[in-house]
Amino acid sequence: LIQTNAETVNRLLKIGVLSKPGLSYIICLSHEDVLNSPIERDKKAVQLIKVGLMQYLIKIQKEAINENSIAATVARTFIKSNVNDEIVIYSFNYTSFGAIAPNSSFAMEFNDAVKYVHGLCLDGNIILGTRDENIDKNYDFIQKSFDSQYNPPAMVYDLMDADDITIFGHSLGINDSQYFKAFFERQSSSTNPQKKNITIFTKDAKSEIEIKRSLQEMTNWNLTSLYGLNNLQIIKTDECVNNPTLLRKYIKMYVDNEEDIDSIIHI
């Protein structure tokens, strides 16, 4: 085996075009690939990364989830919610909700409600790449929308149509901005304003700043208007651990009964 493409792959990983969370795979191409053009070798390298990522995720998704986590608490809130029948969940993960939480208290509840934006590793059809950009046409293959299996659900429409939106653990970074920009742009405009409840869960103060920077760009630097025209809150999960009141306030937006709220927080 000849490692002909390591430099290119490492460059793509470094600039965020590709990602390999927790992977330590070595990208190796067969001898005949030396005769191929650099573009063809890059295509094959991307496919190798995709296969390696799917293998890794299939392995780790068998691990049990923490039922006491903030994410699990939010999921239980949706189950007890007075708008349960109207919930739609969009997952940007490649792992199946049912597979990672087969024995959880909420896995079956959401089985039909979850839509996978970038495919599922169990189906072997994950979408890996960048957002739409004006790049060298020979490298169109690294853009998500050029993948022959790319067929995302109507998330943008549902965001526009929803009254309550909860975003959990997503950085709202540039690579997925095409799914969010139109929504946040509209919600920060005073033209025909429609007030919505928007809650964003993130880890800590550092990630909160990064999210606000992304929101600034997506609202054309009208973040103040986004706050003023909506009920927008950013909840830091690290703070929820020591201050359950923050989480209780969120749960009360959707659940009225105090006993139900207690059961959601304390399983």
Segments the model singles out, each with a brief description of its role:
Residues 1-161:
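Extended, H/D-rich, highly charged conserved domains that either
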Residues 105-106, 154-267:
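SIR2/sirtuin-family catalytic core signature
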